């Protein structure tokens, strides 16, 4: 690329040269295991993010489209909760992916990141808990990765997770925070173990 005429013209114009090519788009379908055959339960995905929907499709999960799902703080939270609740009529497991806190982290919008988490609490978690009240169920809540405001990019630190079982009572943790999660001493070495913990 260094000697390409386009780069020579860019450098002559005082612009930075292109130093790499990133091919994005078409490809072949990855060989993911069928979710139902792997775990013995039927699953669905609710997300605005094409990557997440694609993973769901590749795992032969039901992918649910929600009108107004944007992946940002203006997403249709209520619609996602309603879709998840409805999906539980025919599925055993629903993965609801919410991108808003991550996007706010990338934009260094601390107030909106807090607001996004509060909206998830109010408009996703609470309606799901209300709809499932009196039933036996588990709910796993976690970010897929940290996106600290300070760096505005993904980082490698372990993420906190909350695994709720409607049949058990736990004492000693009164809120879901990184510090409280760390203080439990529970650490999952490999991410795929989380779903196994949830299903046991």
Regions found by a protein language model. Give the residues of each.
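Feature captures the catalytic ectodomains and active-site-proximal regions of enzymes
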Residues: 1-200
């Amino acid at each position: 690329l260094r000697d390409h005429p386009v780069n020579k013209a860019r450098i002559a114009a005082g612009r930075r040269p292109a130093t790499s090519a990133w091919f994005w788009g078409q490809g072949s379908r990855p060989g993911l295991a069928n979710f139902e055959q792997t775990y013995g339960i039927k699953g669905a995905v609710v997300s605005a993010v094409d990557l997440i929907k694609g993973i769901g499709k590749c795992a032969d999960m039901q992918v649910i489209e929600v009108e107004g799902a944007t992946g940002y703080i203006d997403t249709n939270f209520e619609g996602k909760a309603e879709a998840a609740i409805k999906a539980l009529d025919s599925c055993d497991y629903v993965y609801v992916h919410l991108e808003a806190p991550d996007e706010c982290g990338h934009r260094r919008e601390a107030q909106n990141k807090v607001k996004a988490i509060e909206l998830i609490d109010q408009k996703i978690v609470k309606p799901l808990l209300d709809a499932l009240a009196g039933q036996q169920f588990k709910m796993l809540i976690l970010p897929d990765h940290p996106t600290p405001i300070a760096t505005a990019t993904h980082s490698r630190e372990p993420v906190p997770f909350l695994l709720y079982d409607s049949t058990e009572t736990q004492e000693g943790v009164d809120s879901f925070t990184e510090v409280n999660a760390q203080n439990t001493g529970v650490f999952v070495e490999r991410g795929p173990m989380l779903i196994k913990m949830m299903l046991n």
